[in-house]
Amino acid sequence: DREIAVRPEVGHGLFITNEGNFQYGNATLSFYDTQTRKIDNEVFFRANDQKLGDVAQSMTMYGGLGWIVVNNSHVIFAIDPVTFKEVGRITNLTSPRYIHFLSDEKAYVTQIWDNRIFIVNPKRFEITGYIDCPGMTMETGSTEQMVQYGKYVYVNCWSYQNRLLKIDTETDKVVDELVVGIQPTSLVMDKYDKMWTITDGGYEGSPYGHEAPSLYRIDAATFRIEKQFKFKFGDWPSEVQLNGGRDTLYFINNDIWRMPVVADHVPVRPFLKYKQTKFYGLSIDPN
């Protein structure tokens, strides 16, 4: 039975992208109703009679649509968030990771295994250009999450990288870069215009190196590191997120941790303890 109920109201639910297994093509989309506390699985497949694809990496809401980035299928689907039906797609991407909207007609799409960030027109579902990322080859190319400060977009470079890039959105050029620790995995901007990124430090035997992870606070205006919070070897922090007020950080390090953005040290006790499960993704209810 592929019938699925149409949602009478948007704004009271949570979309969950289920990555699936790399090269198995078994990614799915689920919808959790926060009012009824019920979940619908396979909503994309049931609404469109087609599979979502190979590795559902991320999803962004913009312009009344849900934009699902399917990494190893080289595609971004735009769906109606009420009916879950596809309304368009952007194809011929290399290995997309995240999409950041500048306007109704311009967005950036980060990639892995490509030394370019793609420029797309979401209104026409077309690729319109590229941003060359310095110091990368196609094989080592890796750009991830994006935040914006004025006319500049900042992006963290993750796999076998150790930098943040600063992009001028008027020229679509990289105008500056900042070295941080090995493999910054995520990037957010707090209410004080401070960026936060967390590194995983690589792994033992990595050709790129291995070090203890760190959490960095970076001033968006000066693009300089203000604070480095060091973890110990063996830690594997990831998934930095902010609350709705953008004054409190959350991140995964086996447990879930919570930290005010004005703190001068990392917390010593977790917010939610690890209990017979493996935390992998994290999102914070803005309310």
Positions of PLM-derived features:
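Short coil/turn segments that connect the beta-strands within blades of beta-propeller domains
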Residues: G11-H12, G63-L65, D104-E105, G150-K151, ...
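Conserved beta-strand positions in repeat-built beta-propeller and related beta-rich domains
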Residues: I16-Y24, I68-N72, V109-W113, V155-S159, ...
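Bacterial Sec-dependent N-terminal signal peptides
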Residues: D1-L14
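Repeated scaffold domains used in trafficking and secretory/extracellular systems
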Residues: R2-I4, G53-S58, T94-D104, M138-V147, ...
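A short beta-strand motif characteristic of beta-propeller blades
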Residues: K38-K51, T83-I90, E126-T137, K173-L178, ...
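Structural motif
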Residues: Q23-S30, V75-F77, R116-F118, Q161-L165, ...
